[in-house]
A protein has these predicted regions:
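Short, surface-exposed acidic
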Residues: 158
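Active-site substrate-binding loop specific to GH73 endo-beta-N-acetylglucosaminidase modules
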Residues: 1-138, 144-149, 161-176, 182-197
């Protein structure tokens, strides 16, 4: 679920989507930034994360936060939910929360700066986001690239372009077949004639 031990983490979820599905990059947190979410437990997590809207932080957070917020529909254990508990949350078990109340979840988000115009725009919830990502050529190609890196044990080079194109075409021609993509990768020159330095 890509969350912390005791709370959701839409920032981490959004960063994962940006880097692994959209093939983007997010720089590390600068050393002079205290990257801690405020503990104002009377506010929702989205409200507490407003601190990331400061100009200094927002240049990176605008690429992550809107991608992670739709996943607020799931708690830190991955359980579906419609509301968020606020107040004194002393336990990870909702039935044991003391002086807690619930607020409606805001699962709106957006995709921006993705490099794929069809992917750009607002989403109401995680289902819309997943459908957008699933229909994206950029996400598919990023998926193929990650499969290449896994199966070949290295990053791709310019010489690997024919292998990546063939694997992508095999995946598409077989209706999204992982088996066809892996067969294409493992029968490619990039795999069969690897350098052993």
């Amino acid at each position: 679920a890509w969350s912390g031990n005791f709370d959701n983490d839409p920032i981490r979820r959004g960063k994962w989507i940006r880097e692994h599905l959209l093939a983007g990059t997010i720089p590390d947190v600068p050393l002079d930034v205290d990257a801690v979410v405020p503990e104002h437990r009377q506010q929702s997590l989205r409200q507490r994360l407003q601190v990331t809207r400061d100009e200094y932080c927002w240049s990176c957070h605008q690429k992550m936060d809107p991608l992670g917020f739709p996943f607020e529909q799931f708690d830190d254990f991955g359980r579906f939910r419609k509301t968020e508990m606020v107040g004194d949350l002393l336990s990870i078990f909702p039935e044991r929360h003391v002086d807690a109340e619930t607020v409606a979840l805001d699962t709106r988000g957006s995709v921006s700066d993705s490099g794929d115009e069809k992917l750009e725009g607002d989403v109401k919830n995680v289902v819309e986001l997943v459908h957008k990502l699933g229909d994206s050529t950029r996400v598919r190609q990023s998926f193929v690239r990650h499969a290449f890196r896994y199966w070949l044990g290295r990053n791709e080079t310019l010489d690997d372009s024919p292998t990546l194109i063939a694997a992508d075409q095999a995946y598409v021609k077989q209706g999204g077949s992982m088996k066809a993509m892996i067969a294409s990768l493992l029968s490619s020159d990039s795999f069969l004639y690897r350098k052993t330095n």
